[in-house]
Design a protein with these regions (language model features):
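Alpha-helical solenoid repeat scaffolds of the TPR/TPR-like class and their adjacent stem/linker regions
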Residues: 1-372, 377-442
Length: 442
């Protein structure tokens, strides 16, 4: 077995470091083998080394190796070089007009580039070339949602359960699934969580609509959200994810409820606030924060766990802290910090209470004492928005989540929210705008 074959085995086992070493050794013997250069390139992309991967694709692209053109476009897209990625994907389906992945990637890049309406035709072509591909269906669904066509977007949103999987990851529960057509007066409906914390906070309002329709509702939620939902949904039964499931007539996923109710952008239920904390929690934080002499502003810079897309969302802490001044009392809302972060926060006189933020109910208590929250796209603005606390969200110009829609500085989900969008890939103009608005806020 040669190094090329051994590298392929490592790659299939997701042992990317070992695979790259094998490919490099093989290329020392056959430096013009463009197929091996391609394999090294896709391996480096898996390791997050997209710039190095682009160099590997040069030789196979010169040979018009279609998969290298596709992989080159994917690497460019990962780097946020959307214009170059579009050109590369277009070259891919010019070489192979039936390459459905090239059309899908072209459409996805258009959507991330802020052009979801242009993305949809290419995503439809991908589905025509490969019928039944649920990832292509999900891409089309998200494009409709991003441009604000919620009714159309919900139709194929079921495909999310197949994201990066060949089988549905949807929980297989016994009994019928609620789809909005059944009479649920007096019926027991089980609602179970999915996706991230922000999704649960944003969409929990739809569970209350079930109650309004006469159902007895049980919510299954993540432990970190249990106390928050338990307090705010006294008319519903709230259970932890590990609790024994009680009898029910119907079950439904939380984020399927908007489809069940034919929710459009102008019929989103329960305007904020719909979440709060009890007086005891508020009093705890009043004492913890001490006497109030200035308006308080809560800050959050970057997600605690950095995922692929978060490289575009995040902002360096010191960048965000450039908006601080002596005119306000600034408070960090992050619950995961290290010594370096603590030193930086202290340098800018930002208070931190990370040791007291053990769950979202505690975090909500701290947020309840803020006059304003400024954050990038994480669970925090969803939480503060649901509480009715004035919230300013900083968004990238490319790659933003669909729920912030397009070309608007407000949110139909939260009437207390203002959106600050990049226009040139830089946070500096956004931060400058926020500095000016803070002068008026006081």
């Amino acid at each position: 077995m040669n190094d090329f074959e051994q590298g392929n085995i490592h790659y299939m086992a997701k042992e990317y470091h070992e695979a790259s070493e094998c490919y490099r050794r093989f290329l020392q013997q056959e430096p013009n083998n463009y197929v091996v250069w391609h394999n090294l390139g896709i391996t480096l992309s898996q390791l997050g080394q997209d710039i190095e991967a682009l160099k590997c694709f040069e030789l196979p692209c010169q040979h018009n190796y279609v998969e290298s053109w596709l992989s080159r476009g994917t690497a460019l897209r990962s780097l946020g070089q959307y214009r170059e990625a579009l050109i590369t994907f277009a070259h891919t389906f010019a070489l192979d007009p039936k390459h459905s992945t090239a059309y899908s990637n072209y459409g996805n890049t258009l959507r991330e580039f802020g052009l979801p309406e242009l993305a949809i035709p290419f995503l439809k072509i991908a589905q025509e070339l490969t019928p039944g591909n649920v990832n292509y269906e999900l891409n089309e669904s998200v494009s409709h949602l991003m441009k604000g066509d919620l009714i159309e977007g919900w139709k194929k949103y079921e495909a999310r359960w197949y994201y990066q999987s060949d089988i549905s990851l949807k929980p297989q529960l016994p009994g019928p699934e609620y789809d909005g057509s059944q009479d649920i007066v007096g019926k027991k409906v089980l609602v179970y969580y999915e996706q991230g914390f922000g999704d649960s906070v944003q969409f929990i309002r739809f569970a209350k609509v079930l109650k309004d329709k006469g159902a007895e509702v049980t919510i299954i939620t993540k432990p970190q959200l249990y106390d928050l939902f338990k307090y705010n949904l006294p008319e519903l039964t709230v259970l932890n994810a590990d609790a024994q499931i009680p009898p029910y007539h119907y079950h439904v996923a939380l984020m399927d409820l908007p489809k069940c109710f034919n929710t459009a952008i102008d019929t989103i239920p329960y305007p904020t606030p719909y979440l709060d904390v009890d007086e005891g929690m508020k009093q705890f934080w009043k004492i913890k924060l001490g006497p109030k002499t200035k308006k308080r502003i809560g800050l959050l810079s970057s997600p605690n766990k950095i995922a692929f897309i978060s490289r575009f969302r995040r902002i360096e802490l010191e960048q965000l802290l450039s908006i601080t001044s002596d005119d306000y009392e600034f408070v960090s809302l992050s619950y995961e910090v290290d010594e370096q972060i603590l030193e930086t926060l202290a340098k800018y006189n930002v208070k931190t209470f990370h040791e007291d933020l053990s769950g979202f109910y505690n975090t909500a208590g701290l947020i309840s004492q803020m006059d304003l929250v400024i954050s990038i796209d994480t669970v925090i603005p969803h939480l503060s928005g649901a509480m009715g606390v004035p919230t300013w969200v900083m968004l990238t110009d490319y790659g933003s989540d669909w729920r912030w829609f397009m070309n608007r500085n407000d949110s139909p989900f939260y009437n207390c929210m203002k959106l600050f969008r990049q226009t040139n890939g830089s946070w500096e103009p956004v931060l400058e705008t926020i500095k000016q608005e803070l002068k008026q806020f006081g």
